[in-house]
């Protein structure tokens, strides 16, 4: 093993000088291990990742944990390989940090477990699968208007506190319960409390045995937040490539991946780009996203929560992510304020899969008619606000009448929110969703009170609620 010495520490960035002309390769992992010799020192067990060759036998590295206690002159060892993490069955039901070390107090990973490097090339063109298959989520607004593709990339857009994490939790629940699929959850720069809650909820619901979890949370240095998405992706790739599984990869939050990159970029000596982001933003994003795909062996379907800074969709971070996505689920604060959950904007959310040759003619026509009705309602709202409903034509009154029922029927109760709402969650198959909206558009339920359509699953639940109110059905 080749040894070097720390010559400079700048926050999370550490410069190391090596001896005898040896230079570790880019992305190699370096180790610093130091036992405290007195009470003023701390034990150090730190991993660094090589980012730049500066010349003069010196490399600039990014720390994967806090650099507290580091001093110049400390010994550094080149491990000769990139960071590698455990993969396979041993990861299921466990929680890891960026280095693949378990952090759930459930014991160590077996020493003979397979470990894969977190940096690998994307699958070759000839290995990719080309057929398009829909992934049923059981969430009406998603399945009807912006369906997810197996092996696709889906973005969950929204500002702070509109329900991104709850939607992700529901998707994990539904995929595990209804499809029996394996999920990998990468918590990138989000709240530790949320990660802890998610872990315990998944343990209680029995979903944890089908899930591997990796966390690099808000309190951790940018190096950990930058690389933790790759750790999760490496675990997911094993299930796809070696076991031929269809894997779900959840990343919460992909914006923090970009944010962590921008934090270290200036310290690495790069000139900032637009809005202060790193000049390598598109490259870094591409290296991550191109590994998430369907191959002839299996697929990785990725659902990424994307924080939109100040609700500005032109910000370079969300804008760069957009170009990689097959579907977007936009969460709208106005809908959350109206009590419509999930607060998915039915007009702004899009999917490449909403085409008659993929979802079928009936589904496509119903979805487009729903969007048409909601768009017309949106246009009429200004007139209603100024002149009132009475000034509308009979045709427009009917549009408003049905649009409000559609808007409420796009909401539903979630299994993971049962403890807050006291209402049982609902999983609605795509066929039932299409049938329900088709019947609303045909005017079959025009006589039922609109508030009965709120937070229900199937159309039959609306009828039951109306009956309970004493309405003649």
Curated annotation (Swiss-Prot):
PROSITE patterns: ATPASE_ALPHA_BETA. It is an enzyme of class 7 (translocase). Pfam families: ATP-synt_ab (PF00006), ATP-synt_ab_N (PF02874), ATP-synt_VA_C (PF22919). It is found in: Cell membrane. One of its GO terms (molecular function) is proton-transporting ATP synthase activity, rotational mechanism. SMART domains: AAA. The keyword Cytoplasm does not apply. ATP binds at residues 158-165. Keywords: ATP synthesis, ATP-binding, Cell membrane, CF(1), Hydrogen ion transport, Ion transport, Membrane, Nucleotide-binding, Translocase, Transport. Belongs to the ATPase alpha/beta chains family. Produces ATP from ADP in the presence of a proton gradient across the membrane. The catalytic sites are hosted primarily by the beta subunits. This is ATP synthase subunit beta. The lineage of its organism: Bacteria, Bacillati, Bacillota, Bacilli, Bacillales.
